[in-house]
């Protein structure tokens, strides 16, 4: 697995900035704020800025310095490690739930999935190094700060990693329309589980699907016969959360 050591990133917006400032995972390089902007007046952001050296905060009048995205008047530059080296928690936690992305190529979808997964209490995201959206600034931006609280594992072979998970007592659930598929709510996710979702156009690859212990599907009644991968992921990860909360 690859680790991006001290790679520098830039994000904009109040939520992203606050999340990064409050995290101990990253080194802050610079915070740029437009004077009298929404960000400049935000109490939560100003409180979070007290956590860093104020010399790193620069207030400017020129709005053109933050012309991309909907910035709300703030950008943050930071560095750090986003990708974890190993599955260090596997021996400790008996109800881990991981999300596995099999060649999800759209950065917007990747970012939205991160946000959804973090809200649903997913413990980590595994994704392929090749033929997948990289963990870049667009992905981080769309996640709205959720990436700060998520572990990421970049792998070269999804199928091999799933087999490793099986050896660590994980059940593998693939989300795919299939004759053998069961409704997503009829599968148990309260034990160690890895949920696999596929690419936007092609779904889960055949060999990866063959590795799964269960195939889940989301029944539909409309004329449109498919969901966006982000929407489909949302349904299954929140079902996982519902079962865990019900079990407690």
Task: Tell where the protein language model's regions lie, with residue ranges.
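N-terminal positively charged helical leader segments and presequences
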Residues: 1-88
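RNA substrate-binding interface of SAM-dependent RNA methyltransferases
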Residues: 19, 49, 58, 87-182
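Short, acidic/turn-prone active-site loops that include or flank metal/cofactor-
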Residues: 36, 62-63, 130-132, 200-202, ...
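Short, hinge-like loop/turn segments at secondary-structure boundaries
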Residues: 74-75, 141-146, 190-193
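Structured adenosyl-cofactor binding patch, chiefly the S-adenosyl-L-methionine
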Residues: 141-144, 209-248
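Active-site/ligand-binding-proximal alpha/beta "capping" segment
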Residues: 173-228
């Amino acid at each position: 697995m690859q680790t991006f050591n001290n790679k520098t990133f830039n994000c904009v917006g109040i939520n992203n900035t606050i999340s990064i400032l409050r995290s101990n995972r990253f080194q802050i390089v610079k915070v740029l704020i437009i004077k009298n902007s929404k960000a400049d007046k935000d109490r939560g952001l100003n409180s979070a800025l007290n956590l860093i050296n104020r010399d790193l905060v620069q207030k400017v009048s020129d709005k053109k310095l933050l012309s991309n995205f909907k910035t709300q008047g703030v950008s943050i530059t930071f560095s750090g490690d986003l990708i974890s080296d190993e599955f260090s928690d596997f021996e400790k936690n008996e109800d881990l739930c991981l999300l596995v992305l099999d060649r999800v190529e759209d950065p917007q979808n990747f970012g939205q999935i991160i946000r959804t997964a973090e809200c649903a209490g997913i413990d980590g995201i595994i994704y392929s190094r090749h033929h997948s959206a990289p963990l870049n600034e667009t992905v981080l931006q769309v996640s709205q700060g959720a990436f700060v609280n998520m572990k990421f594992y970049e792998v070269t072979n999804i199928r091999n990693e799933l087999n490793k998970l099986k050896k660590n007592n994980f059940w593998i659930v693939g989300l795919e329309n299939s004759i053998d598929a069961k409704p997503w709510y009829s599968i148990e996710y309260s034990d160690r589980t890895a949920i696999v979702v596929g690419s936007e156009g092609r779904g889960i690859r055949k060999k990866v699907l063959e590795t799964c212990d269960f195939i889940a599907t989301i029944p539909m009644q409309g004329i449109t016969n498919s969901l966006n991968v982000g929407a489909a992921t949302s349904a299954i990860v929140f079902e996982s959360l519902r079962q865990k909360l019900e079990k407690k």
